[in-house]
């Protein structure tokens, strides 16, 4: 009874706690049922052993001035759905952006459209550059 009274008296704390629990559940659920892989820079380098790997940069053209990965395709996020039909669904695909947020969204879209081997670069181009891996300008 005292616990319920405490929760009623501390509505901000209760609401925050409830929101955190919901976010935790959503995060655990999304990771378990995600159809694509999230790879770090080492995982991305390993994927590059595949000569047929398709690397997709979903950043806008102006963002590429900071550099880009060798042999990538620049398909800005807003154009991916329109250009999906030009990609081979059977090949490994590595998607990256600046920080990993947009690439996760695009990797999810690709995997839901029957692309079988999709990976998103965790930390995006920022992580790649921070790891001092080769970039093109």
Give the label of every model feature segment.
Residues 1-41, 50, 61-92, 102-137:
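Rhodanese-like catalytic fold shared by cysteine-dependent sulfurtransferases
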Residues 55-57:
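Structural scaffold elements adjacent to functional motifs in cytosolic proteins
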Residues 96:
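Short, surface-exposed ligand- or partner-binding patches at beta-edge/loop junctions that are enriched
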Residues 99:
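The conserved Walker
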């Amino acid at each position: 009874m005292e616990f319920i009274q405490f929760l009623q008296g501390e509505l901000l704390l209760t609401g925050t706690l409830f929101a955190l629990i919901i976010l935790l559940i959503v995060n655990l659920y999304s990771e378990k049922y995600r159809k694509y892989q999230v790879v770090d820079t080492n995982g991305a380098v390993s994927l590059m052993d595949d000569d047929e790997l398709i690397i997709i940069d979903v950043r806008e053209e102006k963002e590429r001035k900071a550099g880009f990965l060798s042999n990538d395709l620049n398909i800005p996020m807003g154009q991916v759905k329109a250009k999906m039909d030009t990609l081979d669904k059977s090949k490994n695909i590595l998607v990256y952006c600046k920080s990993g947020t947009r690439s996760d969204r695009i990797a999810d879209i690709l995997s839901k459209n029957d692309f079988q081997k999709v990976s998103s670069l965790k930390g995006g181009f920022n992580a790649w550059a921070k790891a001092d891996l080769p970039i093109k300008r």
